[in-house]
Amino acid sequence: MIQDQANDLLAMKKTFTKSKWKPEEDRILKDYVIQYGDRTWTHVPKRTGLPHNPASCRFRWMNHLKPSLKKGPFTDEEEKRVLQLHAVLGNKWSQMAREFPGRTDNEIKNFWNARRMRLKGKGLPVYPDEVREQAIRTAAQYGVKVELLNAHYSQDSLMAGNVEKPQELNNLALNQCSPYYQSTLANVQPSRNRVMEPETTFPFTGGSAMNEQNPTLLCNPYVESTQEQLPDSHLFGNVTYSSPPMPLIHEVENLELPSFQGFDFHEEPSSFGAEQYNPMLNLEPHNTLVQSPLIGQTPTDFPSSFYDELLDELLESVVNGSLGEIPKTDTSSESQLFQSSLRSHTDATPDIANTTGYVGSNERNTTNDDDWIRLLLDEGFI
C-alpha cells in the first residue's frame, strides 16, 4: 500500500506544472475547499485534476481565494499598528498577522519591506519618534527587553542611512598612538626576528649620525636612545648611539659597516701630548658579516708616487734586460731612503725575473752589461 501511494505521488509530480493560475483553476479550487474544507491539501490535485502541487494549492487559497481576505492598500491605522508591532516583535510576521484580521503574514511583510526601501531612498528614519517612545513604554509594560527594541531600531536606522559621524573622529590625527597602546607595547618583549633597528647610529662620527625614519616609529617601544660622553670627547663631540637589546637574525647585530668619513688618519697628535686616538683600534667586530682590516698610518716623508715610479723603472729594466736612467736626488734623507729601497728590491728582482721568463739567472751573473747592481754602486748610490 505504501508503494502504491509513492507511485501515485510520483505520477502526480510528473503532471505538475509551474505555470500561472487560470480563472478556471481558481474556480475549481474554490468550489472544492468550500465543499471539503481546507484541512487536507495532499489529495486536492489528484481529486480536482489541477496541474499544481499541494503547496501551490494551499498558497493560492490562503493568499488569494479565501473569502475573508481584505483586499486593497493598508490604512493609516493599519500602518501605524504595523510600526508599533514591528518595533516590539521585529520580523515575526506570523504573530503580527494575528493582529490584522483579513491580512496575511506575506502581505504584511511585503508592505513593510516596500515602505522601508522607500524611506531609505529618501534618507528618512523608519520609525517615527512618537512610535519609538510608545514602543518602549509598551515593551516595559509587557516585560519585553528594551535592548531588543534598540537593536531593531539601530538596525533599521543603519539601513536607512541615518548614521552621524561622532565629533571625536574629526579631531583624530593619523598614526596617533593612544596611551593604552603605548603602555601595552611597553611590556612586550622585543622580537628576535628584527633585522634592523629603526634608529642606527655609530660612534666616532663627529656628532650624531642616524638614519632618519618615519615619525610614526616614535611609538616603537624597542628604540632606546642614550647620550654618553666618551673618552677624548674633544675629538668627536657628543655621540648618540643606540644598541639593539637582543641579537638579530643568525647572530648578526648590524648589516652595515661604520663610516669614518669625518676622521683624518694622518692627523698629528694633539698639542697636549696625548696619544693620537685611533677609533679603528677600539672597534671590536662581534658577529658581523664583514670585518674590516686594521689600517695603519703610512709615513709622510715621501709621496707614494715616488715609490711607484721607482718600482716601475726597476721592473722595466729587469724585463727588457737594460738599465734605464735612475733619477738622482740631492737630499740626504732621500738618498738614504732610496738606498734602503734598492736593497729591498735586490732580493725580490731575481724571483721576478725568473717568473717572467725573459732573463735567466745564469745569464745575469755572467754578463757584465746586465749587472745593474754594480752600475748603481759605481754611480755612488750605495
UniProtKB/Swiss-Prot annotation:
Region ranges (Disordered): 326-364
Amino acid composition bias (Polar residues), ranges on this chain: 329-343, 352-364
Keyword line: DNA-binding, Nucleus, Repeat, Transcription, Transcription regulation
Cellular component terms (Gene Ontology): nucleus
Cell compartment(s), UniProt: Nucleus
Domain HTH myb-type: residue ranges: 13-69, 70-120
Pfam families with a match to the protein in the record: Myb_DNA-binding (PF00249)
SMART domains: SANT
An MF annotation (GO) of this entry: DNA-binding transcription factor activity
UniProt record, GO biological process: regulation of DNA-templated transcription
Domain of life: Eukaryota
Residue ranges flagged as DNA-binding region: 41-65, 93-116
Alphabetical list of CDD domains matching this protein: SANT
PANTHER family: MYB DOMAIN PROTEIN 81-RELATED, TRANSCRIPTION FACTOR MYB33-RELATED
Protein name listed in UniProt: Transcription factor MYB104
Species the sequence originates in: Arabidopsis thaliana (Mouse-ear cress)
Originating gene: MYB104
